[in-house]
Amino acid sequence: MGRAARTNWLHETIPVVPVPQRVSLTTSDGLTLLARHWDAGLRDVGCVVAHGFTGSSGNAPVRAICAGLSARGFGVLAPDLRGHGQSQGRCTAGADEPLDIAAAAAWLREHGYAQVAVLGWSMGGSAVLRYAGLGGAADAVVAVSSPGTWFERGTRPMRLVHWLCETRSGRASARLLRGTRIAPGGWAQVPEAPEEVVGAIAPTPLLIVHGDSDRYFPARHVDALAAQAPAADIWIEPGMGHAETATTPDLLDRIGAWLAAATSRSALPQPAVCDDEARD
């Protein structure tokens, strides 16, 4: 591919959107998080975008997702989850990250967004599922490449993730190579797995997206989520790999269309509950 062709491809696939504004969030456990806000000029729907393990809001695939959603008219707030990027704290691999989602969702509401959708990829997907499933307020939820259960060791990439989290040399490598600070000592108490709480998200609109070529979390993870969330929309994407790097412009278009429809439904007035005693 020549230079001109590469330039044209970039112009066609990366929307022209405003430069994101850096903002600070404070979590309920006292951490300061860096986040980037893409202001689309509207205050109808704000989207929290949560990255995966060792990612950040500054990573190119994450920025492309945020820019794409912004170009479709959504406000976007992408935090660096705890222990990642320029945020404080240590990564807890999905245990405490729902607090980061809560801080981001609260920021959007405080800044005038009428509705808030929470979207996450991989570890970020587990965070938004646990946030919403444990009672966090959201008008729509999207989880892409999320685990359904914990302690996946059946795939080579996840065995590497466990090494990074569970060993001193692994944590040092994650910090040196990716800038990710991981909490030592593991979980004092195993948190609820996404499959254990996903059913409680209903009636909030929920979309679960998973690739059939995901090398981290095989199909049993999305099957576990689907079994517990019969009202969810489940998309199994042919040929798709894992998380942000596998999210194509076409998939992002479809997620954007789903979000627009889902938040339109959420904004409709709910039917009144009939009170038989009052009617008699």
What is the predicted role of each segment?
Residues 66-88:
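Conserved alpha/beta-hydrolase
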Residues 1-27, 31-40, 244, 271, ...:
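An N-terminal hydrophobic leader/cap segment in hydrolases
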Residues 82-113:
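Catalytic nucleophile-loop/oxyanion-hole region of alpha/beta-hydrolase
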Residues 215-221:
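Conserved alpha/beta-hydrolase "acid-adjacent" motif
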Residues 240-252:
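Catalytic histidine-centered segment of alpha/beta-hydrolase-like enzymes
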Residues 134-187, 204:
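Hydrolase active-site cap/lid region
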Residues 201-202, 208-210:
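Short beta-strand/loop motif that positions the catalytic acidic residue
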Residues 54-67, 81:
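The serine-hydrolase catalytic nucleophile loop
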